[in-house]
């Protein structure tokens, strides 16, 4: 019995142990599972956060790239719009000038037609008067002949002589009327032919008429370069203006720097200098001087290329090299506000077309028209520029007709051929375009600035003189070895007094003396 009880107790204990172990194991399994789940959830949250962070960073990167690309496209669009607006304004201005020119031509044609009608009426009235007079004379002559025939007491020789005299008088009257009629018809025909030739020449040739200004625009890659161009405390701008004699204007216009100077050649040199500095990426006073020296060497090639281009456009390929270089210099001179090279090209084309209409040598007419103002780019002379140009072209064995056309286009000598009249007429047409005479004021301002520079150059020790800010400042560069500081003060005073006595100007003019002393030594 005790054994049975013990067995039952053992079985019961085993059963209790099994149940307890089951529940204890289940508890620990649930505890471990909960921990794993929590760790997994934390890991999932961490992965989600990292993914969100990477997504945000990627989003910010793409947004930044899109913004930069949008800003770039916007700048390009604004620049393109600015260029197109400027081009549209220029085309609109050209169209207005062309319309004004056509209106003037139409008015001239109407005036000529009205004048011809008036002359035709006068001729008809004169013709009627002459006819009445001729009828009256015939009647008188017939009556006189009848009287002579009826007179019997005259000698036969006397009567015959009287009849002959009357017949001669009648023949002379008829001949005079015929000559007068032929002369009037010839004048009318010549007038119509001249008008037709001029109208044909003007209609066949279209020109871009723009008044030369004193500004050049240089485009830069970004506005950040403006700060480098200005330099610390503006030292780069000062060095640039001292080297080139050109005002440099840096304003709020995007990606644009403006150069201002009345001298086109000096302005072109400054433009080449600035482009070299921007290409090198190094901008400081020493680099500016070096770039200006390099640009000075290259400007001759630019000038010669301009002469070659205009000669080729007119198909004049036999012009001497020395003359080609002078034609290139015309690009940097103005006449009544118009570019001198463009003006000469217009005269050449007009003269060529009119010569072709009149069955004359069109090639020689174009050559004479292109070279007619060559004297304006030669060294100054006491003679008129037309005579100076004619004398210069003599050494190239040009024809007498061409030389006379050059020398006579301003009436300084007698015209000896139709070619001279054609060049004179073409020159007058080119200069009488709309707005040409209004540019005389601009030429006067340029001459005033040149005279200010010449006044300052007349003093000893002066190397260079530049008229800046539309003539409100004269900047004088002197030799540092020959002019001391005290002498520089006196020089500024003397130049100012001479300007007051010899020049006419509004307001006041600032005279700046720049004296630089450089000492160089070499260590060996």
Curated annotation (Swiss-Prot):
SUPFAM superfamilies tied to this protein: Eukaryotic type KH-domain (KH-domain type I) (SSF54791), HD-domain/PDEase-like (SSF109604)
Residues covered by the HD domain: 340-432
Chain ranges of the KH domain: 214-280
InterPro entries cross-referenced by the UniProt entry: HD/PDEase_dom, HD_domain, HDIG_dom, KH_dom, KH_dom_type_1, KH_dom_type_1_sf, Ribonuclease_Y, RNase_Y_N
Membrane topology: Single-pass membrane protein
NCBIfam families: HDIG, RNase_Y
HAMAP family, per the entry: RNase_Y
Record-given protein name: Ribonuclease Y
């Amino acid at each position: 019995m005790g054994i049975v009880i013990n067995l039952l107790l053992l079985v019961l204990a085993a059963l209790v142990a099994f149940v307890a172990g089951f529940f204890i194991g289940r508890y620990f399994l649930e505890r471990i599972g909960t921990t794993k789940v929590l760790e997994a959830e934390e890991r999932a949250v961490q992965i989600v956060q990292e993914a969100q962070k990477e997504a945000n960073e990627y989003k910010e990167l793409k947004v930044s790239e899109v913004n930069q690309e949008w800003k770039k496209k916007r700048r390009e669009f604004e620049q393109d719009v600015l260029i197109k607006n400027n081009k549209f304004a220029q085309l609109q201005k050209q169209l207005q000038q062309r319309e004004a020119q056509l209106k003037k031509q139409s008015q001239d044609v109407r005036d000529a037609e009205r004048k011809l009608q008036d002359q035709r009426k006068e001729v008809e009235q004169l013709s009627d008067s002459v006819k009445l007079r001729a009828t009256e004379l015939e009647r008188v002559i017939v009556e006189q002949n009848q009287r002579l025939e009826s007179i019997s007491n005259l000698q036969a020789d006397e009567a015959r002589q009287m009849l002959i005299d009357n017949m001669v008088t009648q023949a002379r009257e008829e001949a005079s009327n015929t000559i007068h009629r032929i002369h009037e018809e010839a004048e009318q025909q010549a007038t119509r032919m001249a008008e037709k030739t001029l109208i044909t020449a003007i209609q066949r040739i279209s020109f871009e008429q723009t008044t030369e200004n004193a500004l050049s625009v240089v485009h830069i890659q970004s506005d950040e370069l403006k700060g480098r161009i200005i330099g610390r405390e503006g030292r780069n701008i000062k060095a640039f203006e001292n080297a080139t004699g050109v005002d440099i204007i840096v304003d709020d216009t995007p990606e644009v720097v403006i150069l201002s100077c009345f001298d086109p050649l000096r302005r072109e040199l400054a433009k080449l200098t600035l482009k070299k500095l921007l290409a090198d990426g190094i901008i400081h006073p020493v680099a500016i001087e070096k770039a200006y020296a390099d640009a000075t060497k290259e400007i001759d090639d630019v000038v010669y290329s301009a002469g070659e281009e205009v000669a080729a456009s007119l198909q004049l390929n036999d012009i001497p090299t020395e003359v080609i270089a002078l034609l290139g210099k015309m690009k940097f001179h103005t006449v009544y506000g118009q570019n001198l090279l463009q003006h000469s090209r217009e005269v050449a084309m007009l003269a060529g077309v009119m010569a072709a209409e009149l069955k004359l040598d069109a090639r020689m007419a174009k050559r004479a028209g292109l070279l007619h103002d060559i004297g304006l780019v030669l060294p100054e002379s006491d003679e008129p520029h037309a005579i100076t140009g004619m004398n210069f072209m003599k050494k190239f064995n040009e024809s007498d007709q061409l030389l006379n056309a050059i020398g006579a286009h301003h009436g300084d000598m007698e015209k000896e051929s139709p070619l001279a009249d054609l060049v004179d007429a073409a020159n007058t047409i080119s200069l009488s375009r709309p707005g040409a005479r209004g540019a005389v004021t601009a030429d006067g301002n340029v001459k005033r600035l040149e005279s200010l520079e010449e006044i300052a150059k007349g003093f000893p020790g002066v190397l260079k003189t530049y008229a800046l800010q539309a003539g409100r400042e004269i900047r004088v560069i002197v030799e540092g070895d020959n002019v001391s500081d005290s002498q520089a003060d006196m020089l500024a005073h003397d130049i100012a007094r001479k300007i007051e006595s010899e020049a006419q100007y509004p307001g006041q003019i600032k005279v700046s003396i720049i004296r630089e002393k450089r000492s160089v030594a070499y260590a060996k």
